[in-house]
Regions:
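Short, hydrophobic/amphipathic alpha-helical patches that form generic packing surfaces
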Residues: 219-227
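Histidine-centered active-site/metal-ligand motif
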Residues: 216
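Short beta-strand scaffold segments in enzyme catalytic cores
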Residues: 85-90, 222
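Mg2+-dependent endonuclease catalytic cores in nucleic-acid-processing enzymes, primarily RNase H-like
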Residues: 88-212, 229-251
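Short amphipathic alpha-helical "interface-anchor" segments enriched in bulky aromatics
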Residues: 25, 33-36, 191-195, 221
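Hydrophobic/aromatic beta-strand patches that form the interior of the parallel beta-sheet core
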Residues: 3-5, 75, 128
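ATPase catalytic-site recognition across NTP-hydrolyzing enzymes
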Residues: 12-79
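Signature of the SF2 helicase/ATPase Hel1-core->accessory helical subdomain module
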Residues: 1-11
């Protein structure tokens, strides 16, 4: 027979409080949580959202969060060129924000993602993308925003902010969020793994996050936080005129 037990330093009283305080002063939050509080969620050195996501998990905000047909779904994108594209699906319900779904794929064109949007049968509100969606491509002379418009996908542009400001906005937003455990599983794992590397020379974490497989989901999440905070007059609505009254993805 096997017995599994968890003994957290904050609960057992076996370690002197002064010793724990000293350990906190010498460790990062994640290191302390792993070493003294038996946290398996805080095991990524330099994790950017580790603390906030652990609090969301322990607070019961990573659970079953189904689609509510009474509220529109907003989408938040990081569009890659020859790389991954990531999409978060959210619903604002009062002061809470439900993160109900996540999708990521790579080496696919915009028609593929339009098909994915259709397949989910959500009632959509706004579709939001970063400023570089307006950059014109050399081959076609069109921006990806114009290409999306031709496909019936109507994007708004999220204001451009420094990465660190966007990260701070995301950290401040997470306490308001409820995540669907299953549909957001991949995206949540990316957020947990999103981190800064350690500089042995300066004995500190570098300012810029590591760019790896977790970055696309984290970038889309950052645009989500910035866009939600800045939504209103500062969000640039589409200026193009519709060719038809019917727009299945109208913002």
């Amino acid at each position: 027979d096997w017995l599994a037990a968890v003994y957290k330093a904050s609960e057992t009283g076996l370690l002197d409080q002064d010793e724990l305080t000293a350990a906190k002063s010498m460790m990062t939050y994640d290191q302390y949580q792993q070493e003294f509080e038996c946290s398996w969620n805080a095991n990524v050195p330099g994790a950017i959202y580790g603390k906030e996501l652990e609090e969301a998990t322990t607070g019961g905000r990573v659970s079953n969060v189904p689609y509510d047909p009474a509220h529109k779904v907003d989408t938040w994108w990081d569009l890659g060129i020859g790389d991954s594209t990531s999409i978060w699906y959210t619903q604002t319900v009062g002061r809470a924000v439900h993160v109900i779904d996540y999708y990521e794929n790579r080496n696919q064109g915009l028609p593929h993602y339009c098909q994915i949007l259709n397949s989910k049968n959500y009632l959509y509100g706004t579709h939001n993308a970063p400023h570089d969606i307006e950059v014109r491509e050399l081959g076609s002379g069109k921006s990806r925003r114009e290409v999306a418009w031709d496909l019936g996908l109507n994007f708004r542009v999220v204001p451009k902010l420094p990465i660190e400001d966007g990260i701070h906005a995301a950290q401040m937003l997470i306490p308001r969020l409820w995540f669907d455990r299953e549909k957001c599983k991949q995206g949540l794992e990316c957020l947990r793994q999103y981190h800064r590397s350690y500089n042995d020379r300066t004995r500190s974490f570098r300012a810029n996050p590591v760019h790896d497989w977790s970055s696309h989901a984290a970038d889309a999440f950052r645009y989500f936080a910035v866009g939600l905070r800045e939504s209103g007059p500062t969000m640039r609505a589409p200026q193009m005129q519709a060719m038809s009254d019917y727009d299945p993805f109208a913002a």
